[in-house]
Every structure is written in C-alpha cells, then in structure tokens.
Amino acid sequence: HLFSSAASDVYKRQDMDGLRKVPQNIPNQDLIKENLEKPLSSIPDPFGKFESFSEHNNNKLIDFLKGFEFDFIFKSSTEQYKSGKFNEGLEAIFDNYEDICNVILPTLGKDRRETYSPFLPICKSSGKVLQVKVKELNKSQKKIVYFNPITNSEEDCSIFNGECKLQWKVDWAMRWYVLGID
C-alpha cells in the first residue's frame, strides 16, 4: 500500500555540473565567465555572500523549501562525490561500462556519440568538467584514461572521490542504486 512505508523527501543539488554559460541576471559576470565549465561548487559566489555559486543557490533552495513546512533532507552532489558516498555506485557503473554505453549511445546524436562517456573527468589543472571520450579503462586501478584538450596530453583519473562525475542519465541511476530507491 502506498502509505504503509515511511517516505522522506531528499533534494539533491547537481552542484558538480559544469556551468556552460553566464546567466544574464547575476552580478559579476566576468567572474563567472572566467570559471565556465567548472562545477558550480568551484565557482565563486557572484553575489559575494557564500563560498561558491552552488552554496548561494543551495541556500536559496533550502529557504524556499522551508516555507512549505515539511521535513526534507538536502544533499550536495559535490559532498557526496568527494566523500566517497557514491563510490559503490561509481564502481558498478565502471564494471558495467560497455553495457551502459550500449544503452545510452543510441539515444544520442551522431556528434555526441563520438565523444560520449558516462564518466566526466575533472581537469586537474583547470578544474573544468571535461566532456571527453574515455580511451581506456584501467580495470585494476579503477581509473579512466582520456585525452585532455586543455593540457594537450593523455591523462588518467580515479573514478572515485570526486575526481570525475557522471553524465546526468547515468548519475540518476547511480543515485537510486546507492540510496536504495526502488
């Protein structure tokens, strides 16, 4: 029965996503422009009130939700990726990489299919979220190998602890897996 189980509202902020363009309705647009493609949690708050743009946005969302007077749990993607909370799910994605690509690739346009990977590495030198094709899976070390267009070199990164993030479709499935949502 629908009401026989306890339920809780969990709100997730996708604050590991790279910002693609400068919102026109915010101050300090030059500050944002120089930080494009970085996770929202790595971009300074253009309003100058919080540590990051994501913290600013997260606080606005929390204030909004409090107005409805119901209990909720608020979680930051950045914190969950970096703390290792998602590591079990990331490993499951890694171990099923080919099967996942076989499901996702037919849903993408031709250009995107050529560069798609469920994993998006975070560039160690620039901090940007990279949308690059994974060249190799290092199965023994649980790392992805890719060509970094910023450094013009082949690099690798661990799939764990916030060194990369997942594309949104795979990210949602991973969250449901880790959180035990059925």
What is the predicted role of each segment?
Residues 2, 79-80, 99, 129:
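Residue-level preference for alpha-helix termini and adjacent loops
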Residues 21-29:
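Glycine-rich loop at the start of a catalytic domain that most often binds anionic cofactors/ligands
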Residues 1-7, 11:
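Single conserved hydrophobic/aromatic residue that forms the stacking wall/gate
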Residues 96-99, 106-182:
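Alpha-helical recognition segments enriched in aromatics with Gly/Pro capping
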Residues 26, 89-91, 140, 147:
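General N-terminal targeting signals
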Residues 9-16, 30-92, 102-117, 170-182:
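Conserved alpha/beta enzyme-core scaffolds, especially Rossmann-like or related mixed alpha/beta domains
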